[in-house]
Amino acid sequence: MEKKIIFLCFFVSLLTLPEFISSQVLVEDDVPFPEKKFADRGECIRACAAKFTDGDLSKIKDVLPRYYKCVCWYYPTS
């Protein structure tokens, strides 16, 4: 019984490890978008990529259009 509990704890920690690691390198920042009140998702992705990742769209994880700005989650360039 004790080995099963230890194995279960190890298994759960193994499952949560990738989420913990990815949350450590993900950066949240915003970029002003004065052209529109609420930008399209594609416009936000392009604006975030241009400002934070030197135009690399693959490093943008998610964007959220807000009032005259875009909130970006991205992997920083090294």
From Swiss-Prot:
Keyword Cell cycle: no
Tissue specificity annotation: Expressed by the venom gland.
Compartments in which it is found: Secreted
Positions of transmembrane segments: none
Example of a GO MF term: toxin activity
Chain positions of site Important for inhibition of KCNQ4: 69
Region (Important for inhibition of KCNQ4): 34-37
Principal location listed in the UniProt entry: secreted
Keywords noted in UniProt: Disulfide bond, Secreted, Signal, Toxin
Disulphide bond pairs: 44-70, 48-72
One CC-aspect GO term: extracellular region
Signal peptide: 1-23
Family: Belongs to the SLPTX(15) family.
The record's note on its domains: Has the structural arrangement of an alpha-helix connected to a beta-sheet by disulfide bonds (CSalpha/beta). Since the toxin contains only 2 disulfide bonds, it is called 2ds-CSalpha/beta.
Protein's recorded name: U-scoloptoxin(15)-Ssm2a
Organism whose genome encodes this protein: Scolopendra mutilans (Chinese red-headed centipede)
